Amino acid sequence: MTLSIVLLILLSSFARAEWRLAGETGVVYNSNLSNSDRSADVRDDWAWNSDISAGNALQLTRDLRLNLGADLRGELWDRFGAFNTIGPGASAGLRYRFDLGRQAPWFLLEDRFGYDRFQDTAQSGYDNVLNFQAGIALSDRIALEGGYAFESFVAPNDFYDRQLHRANASIVFDVTSSLQVSAGYIYREGDVISYAVPPRPDIARFSIEREDEDVFGQPLRTAYKLLGRTHALSFSAAYQLTKYASVQLGYEYAVTTHDPLQYENHVVEANIAVAY
């Protein structure tokens, strides 16, 4: 009898499942892909990136939903092909909304596990991100969102192992029914890799590890792995073209420090997204 009840609940959940297919493609520009602090060492580049995903949302209760998904993402860089990446992944998350109203507060707890295959195979590895996000609408047009994430990347070459903590907060404004803009602050703390033409005894004395690399061509650079703290400001806009398609623009300015090292990144993105 108990087994029959469980099966009925599962069948009912699948009946209320919401399948979703989504994809986006576009370009991204990074003003300091090498994460360098000296202008002579800085290397910028742009990439074409794409992401496709399929997901299933199961309404477990009136307010609780289980999200299951799979995705495939990739980046193709113009000048520095060692950073070309393709990576499949799978995710599972629980989303809870405290009421049925549009302005009801909500939270999402999600975990994604994937594998990132770099053209420079030494950098390839397994990526796991545990993410908590929450939001609340202040009015019909304004909402606040924020959260925390922990990322762990494990590679066969442990020089490329990374752990990262990230906290974010943003305000979202619906300008019109088709246009949405947002502004946010992001704090990141964890392992970063900075590239520099040697000798750099000022960095070497506090770096966790270092390796000689040719990913940026000549002259050869040394990759320094260190603990970095990043403060970033982000701005984005999304315009709904049709029921299923939108255009998205984004900009992030970030400053990463580990005294005496400090470097800046300007990242600009433009994407077309579709969802069904």
Q: Positions of the model-derived regions?
A:
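Surface-exposed strand-loop-strand hairpins of Gram-negative outer-membrane beta-barrel proteins
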Residues: 29-51, 80
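Repeated loop/turn-to-beta-strand initiation elements of outer-membrane beta-barrel proteins
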Residues: 62-66, 99-107, 138-146, 177-183, ...
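Residues that define the transmembrane beta-barrel architecture of outer-membrane proteins
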Residues: 44-50, 82-90, 124-130, 152, ...
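Outer-membrane beta-barrel "beta-signal"
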Residues: 239, 264-276
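Extracellular loop and loop/strand-boundary signature of outer-membrane beta-barrel proteins
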Residues: 37-42, 76-82, 115-120, 129-131, ...
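Detector for outer-membrane/organellar transmembrane beta-barrel domains
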Residues: 127-218
